[in-house]
């Protein structure tokens, strides 16, 4: 964030920062000052070219709830040399990456752990990354504001339903989204593949902004999604907190956001033109990656499958030693997920687990 955005977000949340997170706030203030300065330099050097940039083609959007396999699919599609994705550096420094990435990406790599804390997936400046981080940083309008302020929640500015945003917020969000994509187009000049879990609830907005866009919806066993989402909030997004988080509130957030986003998706999926939506299961992508990708390319009428697969196969071979986290599902969790997310078990062919006995747990990875 720039200083102006950070101050605005702090004001919305009554500057309620837990004392233990004051060093984190101090870091954000210093970083905000640096972002503000570099953003001015980028505007002076590249501003006119960025404003004139045009998208090569409508974007391809990967849809799916958090921990549903969107990152894996994003990484696979990034193997296609005719496509491009936002990188981690671009998503985390959206105000100035056009200007700063030639030298800033190396500095970023020197300070990153190399792996994401919630799943050990590689994280470097050049790895594909979701654009929601960039949108949160550019305008402070994103569900990810809940990660910064888990107690106050940032009000309606963190809504997953665009219709619930405060007046003027959607237009501001759209302007910043388009600016970010113009920067990507100016930098790379290829069709952009994007992935952001909240896009599940933005179908009508995205279609209005980008007629001709393609959508890929990936689902995963809801029990695994729930358990992995808990891990995400505990060990991934927790690094962003400026307030003390209530585990019960975060648990409810995971459950309710899933229901709300899928209600919005089911309502608006009919707006997507025929031939522009492809759906798959994460489990099928894991076991039959070539078949899934080949069908995806055919259904969405995308070129270059064979070239993409040559590189994707190399990427998959490098993942040979990767081990996913294992999670244990107990009865209380099974009951909540089975009841509240029942609609997706039936729709996508996942079996409901019968009640578990006391002390019994089921393992998921």
At which residue positions do the language-model features occur?
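PAPS-dependent sulfotransferases, especially Golgi type II membrane carbohydrate sulfotransferases
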Residues: 1-45, 50-51, 157-163, 168, ...
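N-terminal signal-anchor transmembrane helix
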Residues: 40-62, 93-95, 100-101
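Glycine-rich phosphate-binding P-loop
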Residues: 62-78
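Short His-Asn-centered micro-motif
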Residues: 63-65, 193-197, 282
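Post-Walker A helix-loop "phosphate-sensing" segment adjacent to the P-loop in P-loop NTPases
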Residues: 79-89
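PAPS-dependent sulfation machinery
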Residues: 90-192
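Conserved phosphate-donor/acceptor-positioning beta-strand/loop module used by diverse small-molecule
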Residues: 195-196, 206-231
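Flexible loop/turn segments at secondary-structure boundaries
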Residues: 200-203, 223-226, 279, 286-289
